[in-house]
Amino acid sequence: MKLTIVGGGSTYTPELIDGFSRHPELDLTEIHLVDPDAHRVELVAGVSRRMLARAGHPARVVAGNDLVAGVADADFVLLQLRVGGQATRQQDETWPHDVHCIGQETTGPGGFAKALRTVPQVLSIAETVRTHARPGTWIIDFTNPVGIVTRALLEAGHQAVGLCNVAIGFQRRFAAALGVHPDEIGLGHVGLNHLTWERSVVVDGQDRLPGMLAERLGDLADEVELAPALLAQLGMVPSYYLRYYYAHDEVLAEQLREPTRAEA
């Protein structure tokens, strides 16, 4: 199976490679990294090859900046690009402050600005996938803002799914707190990326969330940096991204005195 990663020069790529190396059942034979920065993608490809070799994984890693060659005969195409790089991220995280809004690249005005730059590029890439990849190839979107980008892909008729690590992060944290394997956790995960809530945590057919809210309310609130009283009132655990709304003024004050994520 061939997987193409568009934005393969990203620092997130080694994390993906680590995950693939621990799941040989995926039967990956080729990982093709595509990125406009040829030097950067070759560096990431070298790291990726060493990681796979250390894990004994047989997949070969190919790198380049030719999108057509990259997606040719691909079974899956994963998108993790940032149009304009960290410079535009810095803009998205700062200009909203001028109008008393949170600066963030997935939600709010910064997220919409990023969507305006990103959606046209993603749709262009998707058309290349439609033309040159295998019939039925899935596009997997990690590119933010995930909800808007994935919706654009679907409305254009592409076979696509948008992924976010919020749900699996909660699944793992709840599993650790309850002393069970993550696969035993069934989440009632509702909302749109990244604005989601966990409204149930089911283990062996029983919802354990009410008990967790009663016994671990402070810990759960600390995880998402929100007031315990809010979680108790909701009866759910919000994504930490919802802090930008539930605690808008507090977060804005923090952003004005701290480095942005792009700077960090």
Q: Across the structure, where does each feature detected by a protein language model lie?
A:
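N-terminal Rossmann-like dinucleotide-binding module
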Residues: 2-31
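Redox-cofactor binding/interface segments in oxidoreductases and associated redox assembly factors
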Residues: 72, 78-79, 141
